């Protein structure tokens, strides 16, 4: 804009304020607004995260797809877990304690695969111990079961243990170890502040059976979610992944011995069948009881004339060939007939 020029002899114009004046509230309204305060609701988790349990879940190389899916299911159900790459078979088990220290974890679930068909699970309190070694059997993953139950990811579970865990000392030790590993710490940053599922550990046939159920709000019924697996205890060690043996399961049978027993049972069945066949063959070859001759059978018997026995000392003479060499084809013979 061009500058405004004032005319000669005229008074200067008073500057006008273009902004609108704010409406001033009355005294009573000002006091009412001053008394009102905007209150921000507090967070859902008012407590402090004190239990710093962290569980490292990983495996060795050579596991199959079912074990990998089970490992992923456990990671999704345990918000306080951490993952790690697979460990080489050449490395010894003491290396796991160093991995836990680097990952800032004080508990560990380690899956060890052997012969591409046997799966072992280590539950350890790193680095002091104790640790337990299990044989994992009857694995069923979440994707495989397709149960109707469901739970929110990150929610805290209720741990339910069989009463048999309090009767024997080795099971009491395992109960405390399982509680510290599978129990989600309260006020954990990744956890949800409510409970909607339950982990059950029951003892049957000298094994620990794991199940996961959803708690329905309406009638407090239980609906299974998954996964499923069975833990067959092998040994409990004083240290982490080694050390003096505190307990050894007398009922444990190694997978190699189990497969050997199956092969021996199959071989015994085959051998038994062969022996039965030989006995039946011997019975057939034995002399049968002599039946007395019936005299009426030879009534109509007529003896045949005895023919002299001829022994040929020379080969027979060759027969003459009657085949015509000048035999024409059928087509030529038919052509001659037409002519």
Curated annotation (Swiss-Prot):
Q: What segment(s) does the record annotate as region Disordered?
A: 1-34, 304-339
The compartments listed are: Nucleus, Nucleolus
Keywords associated with the record:
Nucleus, Ribosome biogenesis
Q: Which GO terms describe its cellular component?
A: nucleolus
- Lineage top rank: taxon: Eukaryota
| Record's keyword annotation contains Membrane | no
GO BP annotation list:
ribosomal large subunit assembly; rRNA processing
Known InterPro entries for this protein?
Brix, BRX1
Q: What is this protein called?
A: Ribosome biogenesis protein BRX1 homolog
User: What is the scientific name of the source organism?
Assistant: Xenopus laevis
């Amino acid at each position: 804009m061009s500058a405004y020029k004032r005319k000669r002899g005229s008074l200067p114009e008073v500057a006008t304020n273009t902004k609108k004046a704010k409406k001033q509230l009355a005294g009573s309204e000002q006091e009412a607004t001053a008394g009102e305060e905007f209150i921000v609701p507090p967070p859902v988790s008012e407590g402090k995260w004190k239990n710093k349990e962290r569980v490292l879940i990983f495996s060795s190389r050579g596991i199959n797809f079912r074990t990998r899916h089970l490992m992923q299911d456990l990671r999704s159900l345990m918000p306080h877990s951490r993952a790690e790459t697979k460990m080489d078979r050449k490395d010894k088990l003491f290396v796991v304690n160093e991995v836990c220290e680097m990952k800032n974890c004080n508990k560990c679930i380690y899956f060890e695969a052997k012969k591409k068909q046997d799966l072992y699970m280590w539950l350890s309190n790193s680095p002091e111990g104790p640790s337990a070694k299990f044989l994992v059997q009857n694995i069923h993953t979440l994707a495989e079961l397709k149960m109707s139950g469901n739970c929110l990811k990150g929610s805290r579970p209720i741990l339910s243990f069989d009463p048999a865990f309090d009767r024997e000392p080795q099971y009491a030790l395992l109960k405390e170890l399982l509680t510290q590993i599978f129990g989600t710490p309260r006020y954990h940053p990744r956890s949800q502040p409510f409970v909607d599922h339950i982990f059950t550990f029951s003892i049957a046939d000298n094994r620990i059976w794991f199940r996961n159920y959803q708690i329905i709000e309406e009638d407090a019924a239980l609906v299974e979610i998954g996964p499923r697996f069975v833990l067959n205890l092998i040994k409990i060690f004083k240290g982490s992944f080694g050390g003096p043996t505190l307990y050894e399961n007398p009922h444990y049978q190694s997978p190699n011995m189990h497969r050997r027993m199956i092969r021996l049972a199959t071989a015994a069945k085959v051998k038994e069948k062969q022996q039965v066949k030989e006995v039946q063959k011997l019975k057939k070859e034995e002399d049968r009881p002599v039946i007395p001759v019936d005299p009426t059978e030879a009534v109509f018997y007529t003896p045949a004339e005895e023919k002299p026995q001829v022994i040929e000392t020379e080969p027979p003479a060759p027969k003459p060939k009657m085949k015509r060499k000048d035999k024409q084809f059928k087509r030529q013979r038919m052509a001659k007939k037409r002519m």
